[in-house]
C-alpha cells in the first residue's frame, strides 16, 4: 500500500535520539530478513522482510525512555535468483540453516547501528561468514543532526556486487527443495489447489508414497520498498509460476506460496520452501497411495529477533531447549510488564499489515509480521522499556476488498488492569480471549460472517458504550461508492442559546435594583440556564449519533460542525467508535470540527482563519484537511476531504450588538470572502505539494459556509494562481537551489517576487521547496518581518481609533509601538520574548502563510530564533518600518539577541532618544474605515456639484452679511480665496474633523481613456478588507516630504476593479502603475516641513505610466 512517506518520519524526529536507516540493494538478488533485534529503544517502522533487487528500503528506531538511546541490529540473507523466500519460522539458528544445505554459498549481511544518549553514534555493515565476505561489497555513510539537544542520525548503507569476483554462482541442492522418491499427486491435490487459488492464496501440494504436505509459514513480502526499476524481478515471477504449475511429480518436500499484491503488479505468487521435519502441526489426508496435508490454524508465523549474533545462536522462535532462555518470549517474561498477542486468521483472506505500527510505550520483543495467510496464526509480543512504564500499542491489518482495517489494540499499564479492543470490517467477526496480569496475553480469532453482537468494549474504559439496539442486517454497502454525511449539529441550538441568553439578560436588567442576595440568586439561575442549554445540546447530539449508526445504509465518512462542547465530543466518540475506527475530535482550538471515517487517514492538518467578528470572536473557526486512503474502493487512490465552518451571519446576540456600523451583513460577507480565499490557498498548497499522486486522487469540500447565494459573490480560483503554484514558484526555487540566482539581502528577494507577480502569502510555499538553509532563513526573515509590521499597524490602528488622535499624536504613538516591539523581539532573555518566538509567532506564521514551517519547526520545542539571523531580521525591519537608530542602539540590539547569554541585559533594550528618524506609515494603513469619513475624493463632476451647493450657501451668507457687518467681511474674504484655488470653493464653514483629508483628482486624457476600458477605479483592498490596512488612491501623496534632494516617489496608487485575484499582499494592482507628475499642496493650517498637516488638500494630475 502506498502511504505518505513523511508521516512516520515526523514522529521519529520527535524522540530525543533516533536513527533512520536506509538500505540500497544494488545486486540482482533478493535479500530476506531473518533477524531483527533492539537492545534499546523501539521500532518506529519495522524493517521489511524482503528487499527486492535494484531497490531501497527505509526504517527507523527511536528512544522511548528517559535519558536512553536506540541500538539494534538486523540480519538479511542473500537468496539465489531461482529461490523464493524461505520460511524463517522453521529456522532454529544460522548453523541450522547451514546444515540444511539449501544452497551454496550461504551469504548473509549483518547491519548494526547505535545512537546512544551519551556516547558517540556508530554503525556497521558486514558480509558473513568470513570466507564469503569478498563476494559482495558493502559500504555505509553515517550523518548526525542535532536540534535542541536532540540527536538524529541517518545511516545510508549500500550493497552491490564485487566486480572483481563477478556474479555469485549459487549451487542449489534439488534434494532439499523439490523432487525425490516415487509417487504422484492424487485428485485431492488438484482440488486443494483449485480451492486455495480461488481464495487468492495458492498452495502447491504434492503427494507420493509416505510424502506429506505442510502449509509453511512466512510473512508477506514488504510493501514499503522504493523500487529503482519499475519492473519486478523476472526470476521471482517465473519461479513462482513454475512452482505453482508443478502440482504433480515425486515430491517429499511441500511447497507453500502466498499472494502479495503489494510486491507484484499482478496476482502472481511466490513459493516458499519449507524444511521437512520442522513443522509438526499438520493434519494428514490420504488419497490412494499418496497423502496431502494442509497446515492447521495453529501453525505459527513469526518474524525474527535473536538475542546475540554468532553462527550457532538460537533464533527466538526456536522450541529447542537451548533456545528458551534467549527467545523473544523469555524477553517478554523478564519485563515488569509484558504482552503476548496471538491472531488467528480463520478466513480465506490474506491480511497485510500497514507499514507503520504504533507502539505508544514499551518495545517490540517480536514485531508483528507483515502478512497473515489464510487459516494461519501469528504471534508477537512487547515489553516495557523504562522505569515505571507499561506497554501499549495498536496494529492495523487490511484485506483487499474491505473498506476498513482490522485494528487490534492492547494496553498493559504499570497500574491497573490490562485492556484490549478490536475493530473488524463488515463481513467479519472477531473473538477475543485474554489473561490479565503483569505478563498478559490476548488471543484474537478472525472469522468470516457478521457478528450478532456488538464487539466487546475495552475494560475500564472512560467512555463505556451503552447497549444500542441495532439490526444485524444494517451493514455498510460493499460497492465502489463512498457515502459522506456533513451536518452542523449546533445550527438549531445556537438560536435557542441566543434566546435563552437574551432572556437572562432581560432578567438581569429588570432586577438591577435588587440587593446582593437577589443578585446571587440571579447568578445561580443564569448558571442553571446555561447548564440546561448544554443538556439540550447533548441530548440532540445523542440522538444524531444514534441515528447515524442506525441508518440502513451507513455513511462511510461523517463530518460535523459546531461541536464545541467536550461532553458532545465524548458522546459522539462513545456511539460512533463501534463502526468508525478513525476519529479526529481535537482539531485546532475550539474549532468545532469533528471527523469520523472508516478509511484510514494519511494526512491531517488544520488551518485557522483570521479573527472573525460578532459571535465568532470566541471561536477558532477554520478548515480541516484530511487525506484518506481509499484503496479498498479502488487500488492506489486517495480522497482529500476538507471540512470548513465559515463566518456566521448577524443575529440579535450581544456579541453582534457590539459590532460598530449598520451594515453588519456586508461585514460578515466580507469576512467570509477572505475565509474562502484562505481555503483556496490551503487546498492549492496541498495539491501542489502532492502533485505526484494527484492524478489518482479526488477532492471534496464540505461544511457550513453560511453563504447567501442570491447576494454574495464567491471568489473563483483564477488561472494565474494555479500557474504561480505549479510553475513559477517551482522554477524560482529550482534556480535558487542550483545557485543560478544568488540572494543575499531581503530587497533582492522582494524584487524577484514583484517581477514574477508572486504574492507574499505564497512565501511559505517557496520556502518549503528550498534546500539551502541560508535561503530558507532569508525567506523566513521576510515572513517574520511582514507579520511584525502587520502587528505594529494593528496596534497603531487600535490606539488611533481609541484616542481619535491626529497625525502628530499618531507619530508619537507609532514611535512607542515600534520601540515596544523591538524591545520585545530582540531581548532574548525576557520570558515574554520567548513566548513570542515559540507560540505567538508560530501561530501567526501558520495562519498567514501556507507550508511556512517544516515538520520539525512546527513542534513547540523548536526555537525559531535559531533559524533566523538576527542582523538580517533587524535590517529588514529597519527598511520596512522606515526607522533609523543610532549606533549604540544597534549594538544593544545585537547584544540582546544572543541565545543562552549569561550577560545581564538591561531593560529596556533601547530608549526613545536612540531613534534618529522614524516615518509614519501611510495614513490609510491605520485610519479607521467603518464610516470612511477620514478621506474625501473629488473629481471634476463632484467638484461641479459641490460648487453649485456652495453658490447656494454663499447666497445665504450674503443675505446674512447685509444684516451683520462682521459676517459680510468674512464672506468677502472667502470669495477672494475661492478665485485663487479651486479647492477653496469647498464649504469652509463645515466643521472638519482632525483626520479629514480632501483630495481633488484632475483627470488626464490617458486616465479618461483608461476609464472607458476598465471602468471606474475603486479601492479594491479597502472594499474587501474593511478592517485591514491597505493602500488607497493617495498612497504616494500623503507621505511626500518637500525637500529639494528628495527623489519623487513612484508607487501603485490606483486600483481598477478587475478581479479579486489581482493585487499583491497590500492590495496594490500590479497591472497598472501610475505616477504622480504634478502636485499642489494647499495648506489649510499649520503645515510641518516634513509632514502634511491635519487639514490640507491635494490637487494632483495622474498620468498612466506605460510599461
From Swiss-Prot:
Region annotated Disordered sits at 180-251, 501-530
Answer yes or no on keyword Coiled coil: yes
Q: Which GO terms describe its cellular component?
A: cytoplasm
- Per the record, the domain of life is Eukaryota
Q: Which residues form a coiled coil?
A: 789-816, 940-1012
| Any one Gene Ontology molecular-function term assigned to this protein's record | phospholipase activity
Q: Residue ranges under compositional bias (Low complexity)?
A: 180-204, 238-251, 501-521
Q: Give the keywords, sorted.
A: Coiled coil
Gene3D superfamilies in the record, alphabetically?
2.60.270.50, Endonuclease/exonuclease/phosphatase
Biased composition regions of type Gly residues, renumbered to the chain: 205-215
Composition skew (Polar residues), residue ranges:
219-237
Do you know which PANTHER family this protein is assigned to?
Answer: ENDONUCLEASE_EXONUCLEASE_PHOSPHATASE DOMAIN-CONTAINING PROTEIN, SPHINGOMYELINASE FAMILY MEMBER
> What protein am I looking at?
Uncharacterized protein DDB_G0272682
Task: List the source organism.
Answer: Dictyostelium discoideum (Social amoeba)
Q: What is the lineage of its organism?
A: Eukaryota, Amoebozoa, Evosea, Eumycetozoa, Dictyostelia
